[in-house]
């Protein structure tokens, strides 16, 4: 593992030993925005990080001899409360010749979401600089699950035209914040927007309302029986994409709950076919 530190942190932070590289972009003292987290970062269960105060990328290099030039930033889910690292997903992308970077982003910490968005956009921009990894800057996309799915769609709308990701792949992503009804969603909203948030804030960060003709091409995966994030969230996002003429594809599995693990082989095949459709992987 190679560790590249672009800034120093006064707090104890987490690096992941399984990655080919760990790159720190910044922390609360060196970034433009802060999430005001003062506690040390901590593992509380396997592959789950809490109390983040710095942005790091855990990079898994594309398999030798298979490099497609594509890179993907993976935004972990965890209700904006913690980050559940998807190691197997990163390893699968790497095996397909796609450089994968799990983004340890700064959690919003009860309303400081500017830091979260800064980290997500910074990850995309950083990957575009890594020509030494064989990355084509025009082939950098994003993916994420649940809250990470929300962040991936947010990035695809918030980044300036000309900088947007080449593709977006939300996995059971949280989209419609202002109509979220579950207790889990309410807790996530407090983490994202802060205690005592008003409904307008939830509307402003509902990403289906951000979509325009410049939104990145998007491939959505949902499960019909998801009780945490209703599949209608993804449907609303898909409909917004279609209305604005954005390339889009949506797959709703009949079962699986708040996960697509039961459909791994299917969704992985569909991802590769989507990337071929976009012209990012050449047909053989």
Language-model-detected regions and their locations in the chain:
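Catalytic nucleophile-loop/oxyanion-hole region of alpha/beta-hydrolase
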Residues: 82-85, 89, 101-139, 261-266
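Short beta-strand/loop motif that positions the catalytic acidic residue
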Residues: 214, 220-222, 226
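Mobile cap/lid helix-loop segments that gate and shape the active-site cleft of serine hydrolases
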Residues: 43-44, 173-210, 216
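N-terminal cap/lid segment of alpha/beta-hydrolase-fold proteins
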Residues: 12-66
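Conserved alpha/beta-hydrolase "acid-adjacent" motif
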Residues: 227-236
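Primarily recognizes the serine-hydrolase "nucleophile elbow" in alpha/beta-hydrolase
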Residues: 122-184, 202
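Short beta-strand element of the alpha/beta-hydrolase
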Residues: 68-77
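C-terminal catalytic histidine-bearing segment of alpha/beta-hydrolase fold enzymes
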Residues: 235-284
């Amino acid at each position: 593992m190679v560790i590249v530190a672009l800034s120093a942190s006064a707090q104890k932070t987490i690096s992941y030993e399984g990655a080919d590289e760990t790159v720190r972009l910044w922390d609360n003292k060196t970034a433009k925005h802060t999430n005001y987290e003062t506690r040390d970062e901590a593992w509380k269960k396997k592959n789950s990080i809490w109390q983040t105060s710095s942005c790091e990328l855990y990079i898994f290099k594309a398999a030798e001899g298979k490099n497609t030039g594509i890179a993907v930033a993976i935004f972990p889910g965890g209700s904006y409360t913690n980050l559940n690292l998807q190691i197997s997903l990163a390893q699968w992308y790497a095996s397909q010749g796609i450089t994968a970077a799990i983004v340890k982003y700064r959690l919003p910490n009860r309303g400081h979401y500017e830091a979260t968005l800064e980290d997500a956009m910074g990850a995309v921009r950083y990957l575009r600089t890594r020509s030494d990894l064989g990355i084509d800057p025009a082939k950098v996309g994003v993916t994420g699950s649940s809250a990470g799915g929300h962040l991936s769609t947010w990035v695809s709308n918030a980044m300036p035209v000309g900088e947007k990701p080449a593709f977006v792949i939300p996995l059971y992503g949280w989209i419609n914040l202002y109509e979220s009804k579950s207790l889990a969603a309410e807790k996530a909203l407090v983490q994202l927007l802060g205690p005592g948030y008003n409904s307008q804030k939830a509307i402003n960060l509902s990403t289906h309302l951000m979509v325009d003709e410049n939104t990145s091409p998007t491939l959505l995966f949902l499960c019909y029986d998801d009780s945490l994030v209703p599949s209608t969230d993804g449907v609303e996002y898909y409909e917004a994409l279609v209305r604005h003429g954005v390339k889009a594809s949506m797959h709703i599995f009949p079962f699986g709950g708040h996960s697509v693990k039961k459909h791994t082989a299917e969704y992985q095949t569909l991802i590769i076919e989507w990337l071929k459709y976009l012209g990012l992987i050449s047909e053989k």
